[in-house]
Amino acid sequence: MGDARESVFVVGNIGTAYTSKSLEMREDSVTVAEISSFQLETIEQFRPKVSAILNITEDHLNRHHTMEEYIRVKELITKNQGPEDVCVLNYEDEVLRKFGENIVPKVVYFSSLRKLDQGIYLDGDQIILKTEKEEIPIVKTGELKILGRHNHENVMAAAAMAYYAGVSVESIHKSVCEFVAVPHRIEYVTEKNGVAYYNDSKGTNPDAAIKGIQAMNRPTLLIGGGYDKESSYDEWIESFDGKVRYLVLIGQTKEKIKAAAERLGFTDIILCEDLKEAVQNL
């Protein structure tokens, strides 16, 4: 968006408060905002021209208590949208696919697993945007600098949002080709003695952490643990699937994760007091 428009603000749950930039915004400014479920709980007039929900996975149950309530709050992002607005949704998420059948804004689905009659999808190594009138090649996955199928899905969602916000295909292609991993999201750090180090500390729920494991293409020593959001760790541990050789655990959840891993037959586990000790044990 920043390549195509003069006045763009990136704000919200990424770390820059919306209110901190509000006085700098002009009539023609564009705001790109990451909105958390916590923020959506209390919206009144918030109305995005283009919204998106990338997936619905178990998270923040320490606040929302049930998945049903978490889903209800996430879906509030379309509360004030009209028929001229757009909502981008993940077709492969059953909850979102059904949600898209009964909302007011125009729905644009994305999928990395199948071609869509309309929407944006992965066809071989090519990301295609199919509108009512045409098929538009966006980018080949080999041109991207970010790893993993989930990042292909992120590119699809971002490209669809930008397109329906009025950004040209040329600008979209240029931006997605130049984009590198954001800090703490499968971020390459360095390679030492044949070991590549990645920082995926933004993977703060099991689904996000699974995406990080799936993006690795060599045997992995994994540091995990942290604040307890009352999530289940079974699916995350099952995703190790022979790829994770050792699990180094820290934080509030280390004993809980250790118990879950051992119950599922994974026993190559080291418990540490903090991140520094964990890195020293690699």
Predicted regions and their residues:
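C-terminal helical cap/extension that packs against the catalytic core
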Residues: D234-L282
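Residue-level signal for inorganic ion chemistry
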Residues: N13, E34, L54, Y70, ...
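Walker A (P-loop) phosphate-binding motif
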Residues: M1-G12
